[in-house]
Amino acid sequence: MDTPDDLYYTDDHEWLRVENGTATVGITDFAQSELGDIVFVELEPEGTKLGQDDIFGTVEAVKTVSELYMPVGGTITAINTELELSPEVVNEDPYGDGWMIEIELAAPDEAEELMGADAYAEVT
């Protein structure tokens, strides 16, 4: 499994990339491989304010639906609209083109509470 060192990770298999007070969120390579072929992604709209661990969307695979949880609190500033037409991109490139939302961080320190790559690799 691919686990980039520059990201933060959650027990629920979301990743977070922090840059200049904003963050990009998606699901991990482990999560997409466990889900199988992703056929639909539904995300909360831009402007939605959510707390840490709140649900920001769902991912539907061939045999299951999984909720997506906010790794940190914040306001959604962008959603990956490409996933509406091509949800399989999450399977193909979970850390790149398969990103899901961008957020403005409510409390940047929350990211420090998440796992680094080594800790995440131990739980997967």
UniProtKB/Swiss-Prot annotation:
Family classification: Belongs to the GcvH family.
GO BP annotations listed: glycine decarboxylation via glycine cleavage system
Membrane-spanning intervals of the chain: none
Keyword terms of this UniProt record: Lipoyl
Pfam families assigned to the protein according to its UniProt record, in alphabetical order: GCV_H
Function statement: The glycine cleavage system catalyzes the degradation of glycine. The H protein shuttles the methylamine group of glycine from the P protein to the T protein.
A GO CC annotation given for this chain: glycine cleavage complex
Gene name as annotated: gcvH
SUPFAM superfamilies reported in the protein's UniProt record: Single hybrid motif (SSF51230)
Record protein name field: Glycine cleavage system H protein
Cofactor remark from the record: Binds 1 lipoyl cofactor covalently.
